[in-house]
Amino acid sequence: MPRSLKKGPFVDGHLMKKVDMAVANSDRRVIKTWTRRSTILPEMVGLTFAVHNGKKFMPVFVTENMVGHKLGEFAPTRTYHGHAADKKSKAKK
């Protein structure tokens, strides 16, 4: 169920302060954040965030298509190593 329109999108206060400072100073440095739950707003377009995935910080450059999504959607937390290969079928070939 989506968030109520009267509440508006959720963005952590400390992240919004960093975004406002970066926009005001036209600063293009990477903004390091642990807040994966914050919604991407139109003011964030063009900024680069370093979003923590539980192990390291993943760089996320925000584009117009990302507005309305969460920051955590673009920093995967799980690595896929593929399914285990069947050793018997490889040995016959």
From Swiss-Prot:
PROSITE patterns: RIBOSOMAL_S19 (PS00323). GO terms for molecular function: rRNA binding; structural constituent of ribosome. Protein S19 forms a complex with S13 that binds strongly to the 16S ribosomal RNA. The keyword RNA-binding applies. It comes from the Bacteria. This is Small ribosomal subunit protein uS19. One of its GO terms (cellular component) is cytoplasm. It comes from Nitratidesulfovibrio vulgaris (strain ATCC 29579 / DSM 644 / CCUG 34227 / NCIMB 8303 / VKM B-1760 / Hildenborough) (Desulfovibrio vulgaris). The keyword Acyltransferase does not apply. SUPFAM superfamilies: Ribosomal protein S19. One of its GO terms (biological process) is translation. Keywords: Ribonucleoprotein, Ribosomal protein, RNA-binding, rRNA-binding. Belongs to the universal ribosomal protein uS19 family.
